[in-house]
Regions:
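Charge-dense, helix-prone N-terminal extensions
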Residues: 1-120
Length: 120
Protein backbone atom coordinates (compact mmCIF):
# COMPACT_ATOMS: atom_id res chain seq x y z
CA UNK A 1 0.00 0.00 0.00
CA UNK A 2 1.06 3.56 -0.53
CA UNK A 3 2.68 5.80 2.04
CA UNK A 4 1.78 9.45 1.83
CA UNK A 5 4.73 11.85 1.95
CA UNK A 6 3.11 13.89 4.73
CA UNK A 7 2.79 10.84 7.00
CA UNK A 8 6.34 9.69 6.26
CA UNK A 9 7.69 13.18 7.01
CA UNK A 10 5.77 13.24 10.32
CA UNK A 11 7.11 9.85 11.44
CA UNK A 12 10.67 10.80 10.46
CA UNK A 13 10.36 14.07 12.38
CA UNK A 14 9.20 12.15 15.45
CA UNK A 15 12.14 9.74 15.06
CA UNK A 16 14.72 12.53 14.65
CA UNK A 17 16.51 11.49 17.85
CA UNK A 18 17.22 7.96 16.58
CA UNK A 19 20.83 7.30 15.63
CA UNK A 20 21.72 6.58 11.98
CA UNK A 21 18.08 6.73 10.85
CA UNK A 22 17.41 6.13 7.16
CA UNK A 23 14.64 4.78 4.93
CA UNK A 24 14.25 2.66 1.82
CA UNK A 25 11.20 2.23 -0.40
CA UNK A 26 9.99 -1.36 -0.51
CA UNK A 27 6.90 -3.06 -1.95
CA UNK A 28 4.95 0.20 -1.97
CA UNK A 29 5.84 0.89 1.66
CA UNK A 30 8.88 2.28 3.43
CA UNK A 31 11.47 0.33 5.41
CA UNK A 32 12.98 2.00 8.49
CA UNK A 33 16.64 1.41 9.26
CA UNK A 34 19.16 2.37 11.89
CA UNK A 35 22.35 2.02 9.90
CA UNK A 36 21.85 -1.32 8.15
CA UNK A 37 19.44 -2.73 10.76
CA UNK A 38 15.86 -3.02 9.48
CA UNK A 39 13.71 -2.29 12.53
CA UNK A 40 10.39 -1.02 11.23
CA UNK A 41 8.15 -0.30 8.32
CA UNK A 42 5.39 2.00 7.21
CA UNK A 43 2.61 0.49 5.13
CA UNK A 44 -0.67 2.19 4.22
CA UNK A 45 0.23 5.12 6.52
CA UNK A 46 0.60 2.76 9.49
CA UNK A 47 3.83 2.43 11.49
CA UNK A 48 5.09 -0.99 12.60
CA UNK A 49 8.16 -1.86 14.71
CA UNK A 50 10.06 -5.17 14.87
CA UNK A 51 9.12 -7.30 17.87
CA UNK A 52 10.15 -10.48 19.62
CA UNK A 53 9.70 -11.94 23.11
CA UNK A 54 11.62 -9.01 24.63
CA UNK A 55 9.17 -6.28 23.56
CA UNK A 56 6.00 -7.82 22.07
CA UNK A 57 4.12 -7.75 25.39
CA UNK A 58 3.92 -3.94 25.40
CA UNK A 59 2.19 -4.06 22.01
CA UNK A 60 -0.05 -6.99 22.94
CA UNK A 61 -1.13 -5.24 26.15
CA UNK A 62 -2.48 -2.45 23.95
CA UNK A 63 -4.07 -4.96 21.51
CA UNK A 64 -1.92 -3.72 18.64
CA UNK A 65 -2.09 -5.98 15.57
CA UNK A 66 0.85 -7.62 13.88
CA UNK A 67 1.77 -6.64 10.35
CA UNK A 68 0.06 -8.78 7.74
CA UNK A 69 1.44 -8.74 4.19
CA UNK A 70 -1.04 -8.12 1.36
CA UNK A 71 -3.22 -11.04 0.32
CA UNK A 72 -1.15 -11.56 -2.84
CA UNK A 73 1.84 -12.40 -0.58
CA UNK A 74 0.33 -15.00 1.80
CA UNK A 75 3.11 -15.23 4.39
CA UNK A 76 1.00 -14.90 7.55
CA UNK A 77 1.65 -12.43 10.34
CA UNK A 78 5.19 -11.14 10.60
CA UNK A 79 7.33 -10.09 13.58
CA UNK A 80 6.22 -6.46 13.46
CA UNK A 81 3.50 -4.81 15.54
CA UNK A 82 1.58 -1.62 14.87
CA UNK A 83 2.83 1.28 16.98
CA UNK A 84 0.08 2.94 19.08
CA UNK A 85 -0.90 6.47 18.01
CA UNK A 86 -0.12 7.97 21.43
CA UNK A 87 3.42 6.59 21.21
CA UNK A 88 3.89 8.09 17.74
CA UNK A 89 2.73 11.47 19.04
CA UNK A 90 5.36 11.45 21.82
CA UNK A 91 8.70 11.69 20.01
CA UNK A 92 10.83 10.74 23.04
CA UNK A 93 8.80 7.64 23.78
CA UNK A 94 8.68 6.73 20.09
CA UNK A 95 12.47 6.88 19.89
CA UNK A 96 12.70 4.67 23.01
CA UNK A 97 10.39 2.09 21.42
CA UNK A 98 12.36 2.33 18.16
CA UNK A 99 15.60 1.64 20.04
CA UNK A 100 14.01 -1.50 21.51
CA UNK A 101 13.17 -2.61 17.97
CA UNK A 102 16.70 -1.85 16.79
CA UNK A 103 17.94 -4.12 19.61
CA UNK A 104 15.53 -6.83 18.41
CA UNK A 105 16.88 -6.46 14.86
CA UNK A 106 20.45 -6.69 16.15
CA UNK A 107 19.65 -9.85 18.14
CA UNK A 108 17.93 -11.37 15.11
CA UNK A 109 20.96 -10.63 12.94
CA UNK A 110 23.26 -12.23 15.53
CA UNK A 111 21.09 -15.38 15.59
CA UNK A 112 21.16 -15.60 11.80
CA UNK A 113 24.94 -15.12 11.73
CA UNK A 114 25.39 -17.92 14.26
CA UNK A 115 23.58 -20.27 11.89
CA UNK A 116 21.42 -23.25 12.75
CA UNK A 117 22.23 -25.32 15.80
CA UNK A 118 23.86 -28.62 15.02
CA UNK A 119 22.13 -31.78 16.24
CA UNK A 120 24.21 -34.19 18.22
Amino acid sequence: MAVQAQYLDYVLEQLAGLERMNTRRMFGGVGLYSGELFFGLIDDDTLYFKTDASNAAQYQARHMPRFMPPANRPMGPMGYHQVPADIIEDGETLVAWARQSVAVALASRAKQAAGPRKKR
